[in-house]
Design a protein with these regions (language model features):
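Catalytic domains that recognize anionic headgroups
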Residues: 1-270
Length: 270
């Protein structure tokens, strides 16, 4: 919900907000299973995790349920997934994403004619992804009926926006609902991904990700986390804006249906 079109006070999504103003906003659109893998399994299959089998990130909980003896020559879940709907409708489909490799969830690529993987396993930043998307659009500018899926990880932990982007929110106040009482409750709560162990199981900081703190022990740490997330959202929005600019340059922006979605958000103390 850290988007202007959903009422967030910080200017994190000017480009996506414009799409929202010109299009449709979904107010009752909920992640049916978290984190990433089960959420996307449900998103692309249209089947809740309790039925498709993917309900976690490890062990058998991370595997989709086998169809069993009734499986036909081609898996029917994959054949009827979100991406294949476009392909069966006659569209040429392509994806720029590392998701399938990150989670060994190769079913995610079902339905795409082309798949591009920068090889970062989800640890890459958007400036590695954007050139592939722009190149694809330039090479296919004369093609009709296409579906291009572009995946940016930048709002995801660890926060990895390039330092050269700066911090546009350095002097912008945080939401006031996170008062000292709420912050203290989080500081004294233990467990994976809590304020004490943001990395999941430890509070160590990685020099590779200077925006990403290992813990939140005071309001300075709180600001680092929220600024890190918001910078990731704004950076992704900036990259998405460059895609929109190219579509306008090619004269197809008004004829293109744009879908902006995510597999989950971030729990920032709510």
């Amino acid at each position: 919900d850290h988007m202007g079109c959903y009422g967030y006070s910080r200017n994190t999504t000017p480009n996506m907000d414009r799409v929202c103003q010109e299009g449709m906003r979904f107010d009752q659109y909920y992640c049916s299973g978290a984190p990433c893998l089960p959420s996307r399994a449900s998103l692309v299959s249209g089947i809740f995790g309790i039925r498709n089998g993917a309900v976690g990130h490890g062990g058998t909980a991370a595997d989709r349920r086998l169809t069993g003896p009734g499986r036909e020559f081609m898996d029917q879940v994959d054949q009827s997934n979100f991406h294949n709907i476009f392909r069966r409708a006659g569209m040429y489909t392509a994806s720029v994403s590392t998701f399938a490799e990150r989670h060994s969830s190769w079913w995610f690529n079902a339905g795409f004619n082309e798949c591009y993987n920068v090889g970062g396993c989800g640890g890459e930043s958007g400036e590695e992804v954007l050139p592939l998307a722009l190149d694809w659009l330039r090479r296919n500018k004369d093609r009709d009926n296409w579906f291009l899926h572009v995946h940016f990880w930048d709002p995801h932990t660890p926060y990895r926006v390039p330092e050269s982007f700066g911090n546009p929110f350095e002097d912008v106040p945080l939401d006031t609902w996170i008062d000292d009482e709420i912050l203290q409750k989080h500081i004294h709560t233990t467990g994976p991904h809590t304020a004490q162990e943001i990395n999941m199981f430890d509070d160590q900081e990685n020099p590779r990700y200077p925006r990403h703190p290992g813990s939140v022990m005071d309001r300075h740490g709180l600001r680092r986390v929220i600024d890190g997330y918001d910078c990731g959202v704004l950076y992704a929005d900036t990259l998405v804006g460059q895609i929109f600019d190219l579509l306008r340059e090619q004269g197809v922006y008004e004829d293109t249906a744009i879908i902006i979605t995510s597999d989950h958000g971030e729990n920032l103390g709510e």
